[in-house]
Amino acid sequence: MSRFDYRNTSKNTSVVDPDHSSPIINYRKDAKKGIKFTFMVVGESGTGKTTFINSLLNKKVLNHRYEKLSPTVGDTKTLMFTSAKSVALPNTSILTKNEFNPRTINEEPGIALTETHIEIIDDDNQKLLLNIIDTPGFGENLNNELCFIEIENYLKQQFDLVLAEETRIKRNPRFVDTRVHVMLYFITPTGHGLREIDIQCMKRLSKYVNIIPVIGKADSFTLNELQHFKQQIRIDIQKFNVPTFQFDNSLNDYDEDEDYDLIQECKFLTNLQPFAVVTSEDVFEVRESTTSTKGNNDKPKIIRARKYPWGLVDINDTRYSDFPILKSVLLGSHLQDLKDLTHDFLYETYRTERLTKVTGNGQAFDDEENEDAEFHDTVEHQLNDSNRGVGGDDNNNNNNNNNNASTIPSMSNLAQLTTSTNEHDASHIDNNSITSTSSSIKKSTSMLIDDHPSSSPKLKNISSFTSSTSTVSLEGGEKEGGHHDRGANSTSTNNNNNNNAFKRLSIGPQRNQLRQISETVPYVLRHERILERQQKLEEMEQASARELANRAALLEKKAAQLKAKEKALRQLELNRQKQEESATSSLHRKDSDISGSVQSGGVDDGKSESTNNNNNNRNGYGYGHGHGHGQSHEYDNSEYHHDDSTPNYETSRLQKDETLTDLHSIVSNH
């Protein structure tokens, strides 16, 4: 059967060579599952994060801010959101700002974490599963401490999930590792070095993730300005001790002769940091002139570039942009290095600190000296208890027991102590607990070792026990000062019993400790996460209550102002009505006074006119003339009386004068 033919391997497993089959199986599994890689982009709005991601993957993955929703290839979801005012939102759909709203632009956006899954298949048919974490709202608040806290909590939570899964007795085979392997920090292109927010963010998050600084929109600088900006950033990183990813950390592990190219590449990348990238989502077709034997031919080429009035800037041109180099680092040459450093250094450091805090001990559990000391203390206490429990009539045995009790067990006298106490070890082995003198805590025997000793063919002549630091073998044959009258069978049985006893003494505490950790750590981590969430919810509730109280007070204040305004308007209306009534009454009084004066004036004029007429008649005017003129006078008098009924006093006086003039004219004619 061929070694690559895996049929019927379950029936005849010895035929398959494991050295040749394992790599193929692992490669097939890895090719099917794919390589998982997670990176995070952090930076203020407008530094080019979204355009960088879309350019990195050569497709539309994320939508820009204030851009109309367009179809994307990635599946984006919101992991968490925290408002600047710690007010709970009804849903996360209001986070998407597709249109600019000037009324709400002054509000603090808070911080949100979004996750996008992308699957890439390269030319070798290798699958790459990318997980992209974006941080919209970073750096846009008055107090950006909120952003640092939320990102740090998310990174720690991913470490806690892995730690809880590792310490479980029964692990989940479908567990997904969501740790972030690298963080791309986009520096605002000011040209003056790092700002305070940049230094604080990178120093605070460097404990949980690899950080690579990136300068976005590098085409906004000239070559000299860009080199000066990079130098200022390097000076600030060194001055403020900002830990970033170093490409030359592992140069000592390489051979200068065999790995010369790799060493030079790492040095080049170290001197190139921070990466200055030019990105674009626009695609152009250009003609690339090539010289051949037949003549000059223009070959079309598709590029991603930025268009300016004077020409195009190719984002993959290393003369102006470090984008192709950074892309090769992330998705190629240093992908596995970033993952290994995350797991082997960052996670292990966090794991050690976390377990130390969870268990309450001030020392790590992998300290060999502490384990060895605990083992010897346990052996000494167990032997002292067994010696104190021995009773008999033999004085020599009592003396030996007393001497053994006062003797500290070591590797030299361990065989003698074992032989002297072999008669009573079985009774003490069956106890359910072993007391340690160093901790004074009653520990149960290991559940991984059977309490009933069973003979083994390998332990007939030699009894051995194994600890975490040493292995001791005790010969069960000839012993100096031993008693040969007990026989070979009893010696072999006692040695087997002693062997199991020392196994429990050495392995039992470690197994119990590991079991305690595996049972405790996941629940402690989960309990802490629940407490953190509960505290966060309480803070949000308190903030919401304060916000509602402020809004209620503001509404009450506005209502009081409206009531006062309404009352003032009513008072003004009443005053206006009173003024109108007073003005109307005064006009009526004036009209009545005028009408009364006019009536009194008309009566006086009538009396004077009748007096004048009587005087004229008395003066001897002719009857005919008097009669004729009397008719006209009666007409005028009737007209006068008609006019006298009107209230206009001036008009009546004018008519009276005209009547007198007519009388004078009549007299003059005669």
Curated annotation (Swiss-Prot):
Residues folding into a coiled coil are 472-606
* Bias kind Polar residues: ranges: 405-421
The source organism is Candida albicans (strain SC5314 / ATCC MYA-2876)
Q: Which UniProt keywords apply?
A: Cell cycle, Cell division, Coiled coil, GTP-binding, Hydrolase, Nucleotide-binding, Phosphoprotein
The name on file for this protein is Septation protein 7
Say where the protein is mainly found.
other
Instruction: Provide ranges: composition bias, Low complexity.
Output: 395-404, 433-446, 463-473, 489-500
Q: Where is this region: G1 motif?
A: 43-50
Disulfide bonds listed in the record: none
> What domain of life is recorded for the organism?
Eukaryota
Name of the gene this protein is made from? SEP7
Q: Where is this region: G3 motif?
A: 134-137
- What's the stated role of this polypeptide? Septins are GTPases involved in cytokinesis that assemble early in the cell cycle as a patch at the incipient bud site and form a ring before bud emergence, which transforms into an hour-glass shaped collar of cortical filaments that spans both sides of the mother-bud neck. This collar persists until just before cytokinesis, when it splits into two rings that occupy opposite sides of the neck. The septins at the bud neck serve as a structural scaffold that recruits different components involved in diverse processes at specific stages during the cell cycle.
Gene Ontology process terms (BP): actomyosin contractile ring assembly; cellular bud neck septin ring organization; cytoskeleton-dependent cytokinesis; division septum assembly; endoplasmic reticulum polarization; exit from mitosis; G1/S transition of mitotic cell cycle; hyphal growth
